Design a protein with these regions (language model features):
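Short, structured beta-strand/loop micro-motifs enriched in basic residues and often containing a Trp
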Residues: 262-272
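Hydrophobic beta-strand core residues of beta-sandwich domains
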Residues: 199, 228-229, 281
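A composition/biophysics-driven feature that prefers long, compositionally simple stretches
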Residues: 27-224, 235-247, 275
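Short, acidic (Asp/Glu-rich) active-site segment that either coordinates a divalent metal cofactor
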Residues: 181-187, 252-258, 275-304
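Bacterial N-terminal signal peptides that target proteins for export
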Residues: 2-14
Length: 304
């Protein structure tokens, strides 16, 4: 993971809102009071996304020697990279959504645009009018022909699944529409796509502290006597408690929680001798959790 060092001034208010935890010991009050509403989350994630598009994209494109990056996604069949570039009000691609980045040099920067029926929020202005030019791929080809990029990146890769979101039919139609002189300039976007995914801005790292704090608070609650009754609560009960708790807080898990119990050989023998259920949590057990939440477009992965 790479980290970009600067935090834009306009993000300070949003970050102070996200990081407003108190030192109170009440699990439920703390978490419910400090989980942001969907609208508040959208404000923060959209600002972070805009910052990433303006800083991360130019850096990774230039590092990889890419002059144009074309991302194509169809409704109901999402490209995983496109999904990370959509604003909060866009849950998915609409019809065929094409996002384009064209490097115009250090002075003009990297232009971004949407060759789609609609602008993609305020982040990608629309550059296609279907009424005037019904051929969407024709419009894409026209833009690239005028820009004359030396290297055009598409999301296909033999190595990285997340950089391989372009479908066969979309790649075929794109290449057919592209001027012949540009076709041999098409390359895999894997260096750019992976760079985009692995890079975190300073604003994201500041926000991540809050996300981790929430995850640790949930774990502490789940490991408390408020939740676990020795000899009654099973590992499966606890796994589902965590899943339900995250859902009740308005958050998401990105994998099912795993609970494992580590015991001495003597304890295992006593459990077997007394015909006890080995899946029940007992006094003296060493309980291990693998747990992750999704919040503010960031994911945790905690083993404890």
């Amino acid at each position: 993971m790479r980290i970009l060092p600067c935090t834009p001034p306009w993000l300070r208010l949003a970050l102070s809102l996200a990081l407003s935890f108190t030192a109170s010991s009440g699990f439920a009050d703390d978490l419910n009071d400090h989980i942001l509403s969907l609208r508040e989350r959208a404000e923060i994630t959209d600002q972070i996304l805009e910052d990433r598009l303006e800083t991360v994209v130019p850096e990774v494109m230039r590092a990889a020697g890419i002059d144009a990056w074309v991302l194509i996604a169809r409704e109901y069949n999402e490209d995983p990279i496109v999904k990370t570039m959509l604003p909060a009000t866009w849950l998915n691609a609409r019809r065929r959504t094409v996002l384009m980045f064209i490097d115009q040099g250090p002075e003009l920067g990297v232009a971004r645009m949407a060759v789609a029926r609609y602008p993609v929020g305020k982040l990608f202005p629309g550059v296609w009018n279907p009424e005037q030019q019904p051929d969407q791929y024709g419009r894409i080809a026209q833009i690239l022909d005028e820009a004359n990029p030396a290297r055009i990146a598409l999301n296909y890769s033999d190595v990285y699944a997340l950089a391989d979101g372009l479908t066969y039919s979309e790649q075929r139609d794109f290449l057919q529409a592209l001027p012949i002189r540009l076709r041999d300039r098409v390359v895999s976007s894997e260096a750019v796509a992976v760079g985009w995914l692995e890079t975190r801005t300073a604003a994201e790292m500041a926000t991540y502290k809050t996300v981790m704090e929430i995850a640790h608070r949930i774990i502490a609650e789940g490991f408390s006597s408020d939740v676990i009754t020795p000899g009654v609560t099973s590992t499966e009960d606890l796994e589902w408690w965590f899943r339900q708790r995250v859902n009740d807080l308005g958050l998401q898990t990105w994998f099912h929680t795993s609970i494992e119990v580590e015991r001495s050989d003597r304890s295992k023998q006593e459990i077997a001798a007394n015909n006890l259920d080995p899946n029940l949590l007992l006094r003296g057990d060493h309980v291990h959790i693998d747990f992750g939440i999704s919040y503010l477009n960031l994911q945790t992965d905690t083993q404890q």
